[in-house]
């Protein structure tokens, strides 16, 4: 099984996405709409389709879910927004990483891998490298700071090549 360990902020959205959704939530008189850029979801979908990968959420947004009977249940509007965005593109979240008290993402990925021995290959898509130093060869690094950043077309080939190694 191929796995994509997926962060959300800085991968499926950017600072520009947050600004747009902030204003949209004001227009709809809603507290907050969680911004996920539809184009970036299409890039993710392409990676998933071409590698048959499963998505494991590493984002701090995974705390907006609980796992019950092997299903992810959203705990709030943010969780529902994430699930709805994924569903619109026929994407699903396979699992979430466990919580490390030190909040080190690399430790959380390690714990997940230790508990799931049916993994053939994996990549990590994240906008940060902190805590992921041991996984540099598996990392697809994105950037949150600009509208053209986040997951983009340049990352698709890199991700596919790493997963097909």
What are these regions (language model features)?
Residues 1-3, 120-121:
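Hydrophobic/aromatic side chains embedded in well-ordered alpha-helices
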Residues 2-100:
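Alpha-helical substrate-recognition element adjacent to the catalytic core
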Residues 74-165:
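C-terminal cap/substrate-recognition subdomain and adjoining C-terminal extension
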């Amino acid at each position: 099984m191929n796995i994509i360990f997926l962060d959300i902020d800085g991968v499926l959205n950017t600072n520009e996405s947050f600004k747009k959704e902030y204003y949209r939530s004001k227009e709809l008189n809603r507290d907050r709409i969680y911004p996920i850029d539809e184009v970036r979801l299409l890039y993710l979908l392409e990676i998933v389709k071409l590698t048959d990968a499963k998505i494991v959420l590493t984002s701090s947004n995974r705390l907006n879910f609980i796992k019950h009977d092997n299903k992810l249940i959203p705990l709030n509007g943010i969780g529902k927004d994430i699930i709805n965005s994924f569903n619109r593109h026929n994407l699903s979240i396979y699992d979430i990483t466990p919580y490390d008290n030190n909040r080190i993402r690399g430790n959380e990925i390690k714990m997940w891998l230790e508990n799931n021995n049916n993994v053939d290959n994996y990549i990590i898509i994240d906008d940060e490298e902190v805590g992921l130093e041991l996984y540099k060869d598996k990392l697809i690094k994105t950037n949150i700071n600009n509208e053209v950043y986040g997951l983009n077309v340049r990352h698709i080939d890199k991700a596919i090549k790493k997963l097909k190694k």
